[in-house]
Amino acid sequence: AKPRSNWAAAEDDRPLAATGKRQALASSRLFAAWAPSRIISSPWLRCVQTVTPYSVDYGVSVKEKKSLSEAGAQRHPARTARTVASLFDKDSSSLLCTHRPVLPQVMNVLREYLFEGSAEVLPTEDPYLEPGDALVLQVTEGDNPRIVSVERVRAALD
């Protein structure tokens, strides 16, 4: 995203910088390997810009959730937790986009779905992810979904 220090307008309107736009295009090709059939994103512009290339290229609509924005997560952390937990409700591949300040809440929910004794597979401190990074989670199917592996990925820029 454009640096906060260089942005005077509303935070939710802060767009991706040129590098972020290139990363979003490259990530679209990377995400295709997992074929997410649903996209859940913060409604803030830079998150929507991040998932739009995949959405357009593969015909998957974006469901915007205020609870994934920085302001929404700060105001209603329980809603944010429910939104993240909803990823485990269906036996389908999902793509979630949020903001770095929300990642501690996201990681707390993901830890609940780890097999006992495997907490070290998730990032534990800020920065949890660098700009352009993503976590890919492989999850068991069924009534009691569990994360079996976590892979940190970054799309290669052309």
State each model region's role.
Residues 1-75, 81-82, 104, 110, ...:
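Active-site-proximal alpha-helix that buttresses catalytic centers in soluble enzyme cores
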Residues 36, 91, 144-148:
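A broad structural signal for short, well-ordered beta-strand segments within beta-sheet-rich domains
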Residues 40, 92-106:
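Beta-strand elements within well-structured catalytic alpha/beta cores of enzymes
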Residues 78-92:
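A short, acidic, amphipathic alpha-helical segment used as a generic capping/interface helix at domain edges
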Residues 88-89, 97, 128:
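Extracellular/periplasmic catalytic domains that process cell-envelope and extracellular macromolecules
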Residues 91-93, 131-134:
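Active-site lining segments that contact anionic ligands and/or coordinate catalytic metals
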Residues 133-144:
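Short phosphate-coordinating micro-motif centered on Lys-Gly-acidic
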Residues 158:
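SAM/dcSAM-binding transferase cores
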